Swiss-Prot record:
One of its GO terms (molecular function) is G protein-coupled receptor binding. The gene is goa-1. Disruption phenotype: Prolonged exposure to attractive odorant benzaldehyde results in a loss of adaptive response characterized by a decrease in odor seeking behavior and in a loss of egl-4 nuclear translocation. Loss of chemotaxis response to the repellent odor 2-nonanone. Increased egg laying; eggs are prematurely laid at one-cell to 8-cell stage. Increased locomotion. Increases diacylglycerol (DAG) levels along axons. Increases paralysis following treatment with acetylcholinesterase inhibitor aldicarb which is partially reduced in a drn-1 mutant background. Residues 266-273 are annotated as: G4 motif. GTP binds at residues 40-47, 176-182, 201-205, 270-273, 326. Belongs to the G-alpha family. G(i/o/t/z) subfamily. It comes from Caenorhabditis elegans. Residues 174-182 are annotated as: G2 motif. This is Guanine nucleotide-binding protein G(o) subunit alpha.
Amino acid sequence: MGCTMSQEERAALERSRMIEKNLKEDGMQAAKDIKLLLLGAGESGKSTIVKQMKIIHESGFTAEDYKQYKPVVYSNTVQSLVAILRAMSNLGVSFGSADREVDAKLVMDVVARMEDTEPFSEELLSSMKRLWGDAGVQDCFSRSNEYQLNDSAKYFLDDLERLGEAIYQPTEQDILRTRVKTTGIVEVHFTFKNLNFKLFDVGGQRSERKKWIHCFEDVTAIIFCVAMSEYDQVLHEDETTNRMHESLKLFDSICNNKWFTDTSIILFLNKKDLFEEKIKKSPLTICFPEYSGRQDYHEASAYIQAQFEAKNKSANKEIYCHMTCATDTTNIQFVFDAVTDVIIANNLRGCGLY
């Protein structure tokens, strides 16, 4: 008789089961909402990753996007050439042919009149082609680690003929290669593997960092981008600071921040294509004087990875590292797939469901 449950007890047990069921459902829903924060120093490739998410997980760029990026392509191309011309003067590099002085003045005048976002006139296009083919300009370009130059300078300047066509329309790759400084916070939403992603890109320059703070709450994972190819370059904002050293310092402050004790950290060692070319001719000892390995992509990139992993002071925190090329859609698709699997496993574990 004592084993029979009273009506109240049965109701209480049913209530308890319902609460447990609801909690589990809430946990599963929480595990489906993923908030990713893209961090990293300026020009590390964060905005390119955001563009890739639009290509891979949304319907790509809209007709309006293509229209809006056209003047950006023109401007990036002209401004890249101007950056080289200004550096020639500072580095004491002369033109291969004295006739290029006239062409250089024409290009400089276009920028002075703020016409660099407009389609190239025939005169401007001819001048730019002659300048880009000049031995002195190429010599100065080969020393681009000594001044500030857009990574995509060669990509655009090698293709002046196509960009100068009257019917020119940007391609997907052109848009991925454009450089516009991110100010404020860019947010992208998409669904992948039955998960709802919110991806936040915040300005990487030092002056922008104070704007990150309110994004930090409830972050599932941080994707930290590093431009591997910048080991021999200095910052825009402070020309005495090595870019790789700045990235390491920033990574240290993010990785060991008390807010991120339980946050997955994914490290994208980006611009691997540029790094692979550069490491053949520019020694890693510029950034890491103690490096005694070979000037070889695999050995040098493994050394850089180890420097970042060594900043992690927590025995319980794992850093998930990937070598990436943000302008390569196939590479980013593959890497993001792997990243998502890690997030799913960690998230389910955190909700007690794995």
